Amino acid sequence: MKAAPHGDRFLWIADEEGRRNIWVAEKTGSAWAVHRVTNDDADDGIEIGDISWTPDGQQIVYVRGGDFEFPERPSPNPDLLPQGVEQDIYIVSAHGGDTRKLAAGREPEVSPDGGTVAYIDDDQIWTLDLRDAAAKPAQLFHGRGRPDSLTWSPDGKYLAFASGRGDHGFIGVFSFANQTLSYVDPSTEIDREPVWSPDSRHIAFVRIPPDTSGVSFKPRRSAPPWSIRIADVTTGEGHEIWRAHDGPGSVFHGTESEQQLYWTAGDHIVFPWEGTGWLHLYTVSTSGGTATDLTPGDFEVDYVAFSGDRRTLVYSSNQDDIDRRHLWQVAADGGAPHELTHGDGLEVIPVLAPDGTLAVLRADAHWPLRPAIVESDGQMRDMTPQMMPKDFPADKLVTPKQVIFSAADGMQIHGQLFLPAGDADGKHPAVVFFHGGSRRQMLLGFHYMEYYSNAYAMNEYLTSLGYVVLSVNYRSGIGYGLDFREALNYGAAGASEFNDVEGAGLYLRSRSDVDGAHIGVWGGSYGGYLTALALARASDLFAAGVDLHGVHDWNLELQNWGPYNPNADPNAARIAWESSPLASVKTWKSPVLLIQGDDDRNVQFSNTVRLAAALRAQGTPFEEHVFPDEIHDFLLHRDWITAYTLGSEFFNRYLKGVPASQ
């Protein structure tokens, strides 16, 4: 969701059963008029993203096609379109109408005067003159590395970007007046997150020492500290204005927002830091000195909006309501924050218009994510009530309850418990859900990420079928502080999350309303990993499972996330193997349904191939469903429907004894 540069207008992308389109809301009097800008009417698996307004607010630039998580990979084509799918940049009037293709590429950024768009294609930066419909793309320069974070200077004379070089990275600056490229303050570390000073003379950026261990999915509570630097654009000289302490917060961890640094009107830099063990916003003078915590307390900041006058920050956090999100506001240069919203809903992604109008993407236990206006009294007014399907069963959904249970090792774990409505007596089959990530937190309502909004809907559906459902926020997830996220021995370093898996099953078994002999487990990605681990190590506790694109061999999966050689550290490779479901496959007895797309870029499809082969060899009952050319986060709406239909039918057969035909 983004605000127009002028007036009260906001845009966002809506996905209606696979039909992805851009919508605009504009204030007319005291009401909001909403219209669709683009007209894609097919569930074709083609995503749109990288949306932005032109500076005059009259047009919208966006990208259609490609993989926005792995932009360097070929465009996925799960709909098996014979012509294939390309990633292209388009422009369209904010009032709707015909779209115009500008060029092949991604990450378009329009210059402050609206005359030029810069973008990335094939790891090079290109520009196109927007004032001339016949103009051809021109490569700005020939550069090494992988560019991203294109950022125009406020005066439009420079373009800054981050240049990833593997184990190091630079901040590049192109001067349009001189037609020269330079890299400011280069080092052997990784420079990223560039932000301009208001006068276009300096750039602030983050400098991060590289992690040379080469192993992902392991705890990392400390490292050589990261820092914030400011460089002079003319000379290229830079200096440090702040450095993290040793220990907690020495590893850089950003918010969910696209931008991490904010240059304020008072010449301060606002930035995220975990110095207290919780992700907060801090401010430090551009001349250096001690940083001030703007958001003190035991909670985490999620998304951040920065006012056009550079004086105010609005952010979402779980302050005073750890399993929800609400909005808070604080002065950019310091002062006490104050609460803007509260209640039983989830107010997650704030957006500020130039005149101070505050919009937010919000959800709750009964309605999924939707745009709303936040009034001065904290009340919220939905912009698009007419967009909700008339047959949406909001009144039939239950409100999950917050529960806290003990893991097998005693750690306290949060979850959301879904209880069948109007059926308090008797014992029910139950299902445990594990989210993916693992850097995620499930909430007491529809999630703000589409993948987990779908999962929340699945949990509600299973509840409507008579299941007690427990969604688990296991260790190594977010929301509960640094030490919880960087849990000791998690993932490939020891699978300590299995304590939470076992604790969840035992918690359900102890409930008087649960049939302890019929507890199932399901999840996707990292949740698929924990589902497989549950079945491999505890088939006596979990009677059946649905595993969507799960990790089954860490030594295979780690190769997907960077250079990894299992032979380089045999002891670490041994622990990674022992932390894998395949290492315990001999004790896997319960039936499982395996689901994955074979163009998965997050979890190698070989994980499922190897697990299926092992289960087949030992006679463990399993079923499978493969989506050819589908990726990790299914792009086709009908693939989600198929996966969840098969999953619910599988549980009905093995946990309720319902024949397949029913």
Give residue ranges: language-model regions.
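Conserved beta-strand position repeated across blades of beta-propeller domains
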Residues: K2-A4, S52, E109, T151, ...
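Residue-level detector of Asp-centered blade-edge/turn motifs that repeat once per structural unit
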Residues: P5-H6, P55-D56, P112-D113, P154-D155, ...
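Blade-loop segments of beta-propeller domains
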Residues: W32-P55
